[in-house]
Swiss-Prot record:
Member of the two-component regulatory system PhoP/PhoQ involved in virulence, adaptation to low Mg(2+) environments and the control of acid resistance genes. In low periplasmic Mg(2+), PhoQ functions as a membrane-associated protein kinase that undergoes autophosphorylation and subsequently transfers the phosphate to PhoP, resulting in the expression of PhoP-activated genes (PAG) and repression of PhoP-repressed genes (PRG). The gene is phoQ. This is Sensor protein PhoQ. The lineage of its organism: Bacteria, Pseudomonadati, Pseudomonadota, Gammaproteobacteria, Enterobacterales. Residues 38-194 are periplasmic. It comes from Escherichia coli O157:H7. Residues 274-480 form the Histidine kinase domain. Homodimer.
Length: 486
């Protein structure tokens, strides 16, 4: 049973729409139908009463009062509007004249009815109605069909009572006219039977139209569901913003969420790539130190501080990149002041160990007064990548110089290597792009360096060195030690 319920519940929007609208249409159809039928019934009763009153007036015209007796002479070719049975009473309720002798009908006439004009109904069984119909064969045949279907069926006859005041030629009379054809056998009564068929046909016609209306109305939601499935299957990046007014806000917020999640994912992936790249230098120093220990070129006491320093740097780098990954775009940069010379000394010392076999000669021309304002790890990451590239591609010499203004810090790194072709001087800053594909590397370092300098409103400019190789000018902006007043 639970499985069966799960197939139908919760109901889809289309089924809900169809059930709700079908219920509304059904209720309205029933309400309108009942109002129409009640109105028709009232109109039918009024029409019947007018017809029977016309018959009553006809008999009153034909009636004559002679010798204290009532005489009614009916012409042979009289044209009556409908088959009727007429009874005439005096003011005391005594029967003066009857069109035919029908005892059961005379008993059904209530004395109270004879006191005023009115419209009434009497109930009779099929056999009594048959006596009242006399020679109407078509109606008798219909009545026989009713008798065959239900022998206990009851028929309803309309009765019109009209009171005529006394005149010089006629005493006060009450004429009762009974419609001999029961209401159930009149063609106008069939409207009650037709109502069920009309209501059924109405629903059969309306439900397909409601289905079309539901399909058309819910198309934007179906389109949105399809786009969400495409997102799940990675066939789409964003939802289509061109949708209905009611869904615009939802789609816009979902697209913002998707963009935010994609940017966060890209940021984590980029940060992880940058972290692995930043660990290359300290790991290379550790590897070089271990190699020196193995070949006994360095004692344990000499190697220990070097290894501890690189392990500390690895720990700092991991913490630094975890912090970067959790930073939001509007996070303020650190305003710490760091002397540049000691930072570059540590970097060159580590790189000398990495490129010990190559015999790189790194020279520094840095004034002790020059300082960097910002996050120390940002400076180390930028200059570490730039210096690593210089040491990797130089023949022997790498020169570092620096100068500072109120707003900017300029650090120039030059080498005597093959240099960078003019057409490649912008490409090298794109992630994954490398000029020399023969040497190991991922093409990440300079891209990371430029991204960090942009956070300081700075840049890195590649050019040609006086030594014959590459010249990299690193520019850090926002170097005022205290924020300026706005």
């Amino acid at each position: 049973m639970k499985k069966l319920l799960h197939l139908f519940f919760p109901l889809s929007l289309r089924v809900r729409f169809l059930l709700a609208t079908a219920a509304v249409v059904l209720v309205l159809s029933l309400a309108y139908g009942m109002v129409a039928l009640i109105g028709y019934s009232v109109s039918f009763d009024k029409t019947t009463f007018r017809l029977l009153r016309g018959e009553s007036n006809l008999f009153y015209t034909l009636a004559k009062w002679e010798n204290n007796k009532l005489h009614v002479e009916l012409p042979e070719n009289i044209d009556k509007q409908s088959p009727t049975m007429t009874l005439i009473y005096d003011e005391n309720g005594q029967l003066l004249w009857a069109q035919r002798d029908v005892p059961w009908l005379m008993k059904m006439i209530q004395p109270d009815w004879l006191k005023s004009n009115g419209f009434h109904e009497i109930e009779a069984d099929v056999n009594d109605t048959s006596l009242l119909l006399s020679g109407d064969h078509s109606i008798q045949q219909q009545l026989q069909e009713v008798r065959e279907d239900d022998d206990d069926a009851e028929m309803t006859h309309s009765v019109a009572v009209n009171v005529y005041p006394a005149t010089s030629r006629m005493p006060k009379l009450t004429i009762v006219v009974v419609d001999t054809i029961p209401v159930e056998l009149k063609s106008s009564y069939m409207v009650w039977s037709w109502f069920i068929y009309v209501l059924s046909a109405n629903l059969l016609l309306v439900i397909p139209l409601l289905w079309v209306a539901a399909w058309w109305s819910l198309r934007p939601i179906e389109a949105l569901a399809k786009e969400v499935r495409e997102l799940e299957e990675h066939n789409r990046e964003l939802l289509n913003p061109a949708t209905t007014r009611e869904l615009t806000s939802l789609v816009r917020n979902l697209n913002r969420l998707l963009k935010s999640e994609r940017e966060r994912y890209d940021k984590y992936r980029t940060t992880l790539t940058d972290l692995t790249h930043s660990l290359k230098t300290p790991l290379a120093v550790l590897q070089s130190t271990l190699r020196s220990l193995r070949s006994e070129k360095m004692s344990v006491s000499d190697a220990e501080p070097v290894m501890l320093e690189q392990i500390s740097r690895i720990s700092q780098q991991i913490g630094y990149y975890l912090h970067r990954a959790s930073m939001h775009g509007g996070t303020l940069l650190s305003r710490e002041l760091h002397p540049v010379a000691p930072l570059l000394d540590n970097l060159t010392s580590a790189l000398n160990k990495v490129y010990q076999r190559k015999g790189v000669n790194i020279s520094l021309d840095i004034s002790p007064e020059i300082s960097f304002v910002g996050e120390q790890n940002d400076f180390v990451e930028v200059m570490g990548n730039v210096l690593d590239n210089a040491c990797k591609y130089c023949l022997e010499f790498v020169e570092i110089s620096a100068r500072q203004t109120d707003e900017h810090l300029y650090i120039v790194v030059e080498d005597d290597g093959p240099g960078i072709p003019l057409s490649k001087r912008e490409v090298i800053f794109d992630r994954g792009q490398r000029v020399d594909t023969l040497r190991p590397g991922q093409g990440v370092g300079l891209a990371v360096a430029r991204e960090i300098t942009k956070q300081y409103e700075g840049k890195i400019v590649a050019g040609e060195s006086m030594l014959g190789g590459a010249r990299m000018e690193v520019i850090f902006g926002r170097q005022h030690s205290t924020p300026k007043d706005e």
